């Protein structure tokens, strides 16, 4: 039985939930970047998205747009995905590249320093670190000893709902750094064993704090730019207390 338009729209939104801001590792849907979504009976999906400022980096914008196209195109009934960026200094150029199936390098020519693969890899590693830190701190807070934590059998470990969610999110990124045959639950970004957990955690914390700072700033800028209620203002961001150690 074919799906109706509302069901297809729901599937598209679920696909967009898998697309993250590369720096923040948060879904573009949660960040309220998606401004418009339409599904036509012929299987054409049109997505309009926005960013917090007119000057957001072109490579970030292109990366997110390409990821939206890729994820939505995996739905079996989709025939075409049109992604359009609005109110951005490079919107015309980015939209032209997306509409014509061009790479970032082909779209920007000499203005592009490199293709997106290297940038994507950089932010995948940061996402790995943030998710790893969240799970490690959860386990330590619940009594697991740092000395043996790397050898925990994660998949068999009984966890509550919060822990299960943290485990799932971490395992989604674990293979970025660890080989499938790697017996240790936790390795560093080079795939090496973690020799001393405490200084390693401090390194991870710096990555997380930076991402939290950028996330709060992003939401504040988005709310200020589009004059929306319900989002933190820049003043509230400035007053945000430091994260507990």
Regions found by a protein language model. Name each.
Residues 1-54, 59-245:
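Domain-level signature for proteins that mediate thiol-based redox and metal-cofactor handling
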């Amino acid at each position: 039985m074919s799906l109706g338009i509302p069901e297809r729209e729901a599937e598209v939104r679920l696909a967009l939930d898998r697309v993250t801001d590369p720096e923040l590792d948060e879904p573009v849907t949660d960040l309220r970047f998606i401004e418009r979504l339409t599904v036509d009976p012929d299987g054409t999906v049109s997505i309009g998205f926005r960013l917090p400022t007119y000057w957001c980096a072109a490579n970030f914008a292109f990366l997110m747009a390409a990821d939206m196209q890729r994820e939505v195109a995996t739905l079996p009934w989709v025939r075409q995905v049109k992604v359009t960026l609005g109110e951005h200094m490079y919107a015309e150029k980015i939209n032209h590249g997306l509409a014509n199936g061009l790479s970032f390098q082909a779209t920007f020519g000499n203005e592009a320093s490199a293709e997106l693969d290297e940038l994507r890899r950089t932010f995948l590693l940061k996402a790995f670190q943030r998710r790893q830190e969240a799970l490690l701190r959860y386990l330590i807070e619940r009594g697991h000893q740092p000395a043996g934590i790397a050898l925990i059998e994660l998949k068999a470990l009984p966890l509550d709902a919060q822990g299960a969610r943290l485990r799932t999110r971490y395992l989604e990124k674990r293979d970025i750094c660890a080989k499938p045959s790697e017996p240790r639950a936790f390795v560093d970004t080079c795939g090496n064993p973690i020799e001393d957990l405490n200084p390693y955690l401090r390194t991870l914390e710096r990555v997380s704090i930076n991402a939290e700072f950028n996330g709060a700033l992003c939401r504040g800028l988005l709310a200020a730019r589009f004059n929306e209620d319900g989002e933190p203002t820049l003043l509230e961001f400035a007053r945000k207390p430091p994260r507990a150690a």
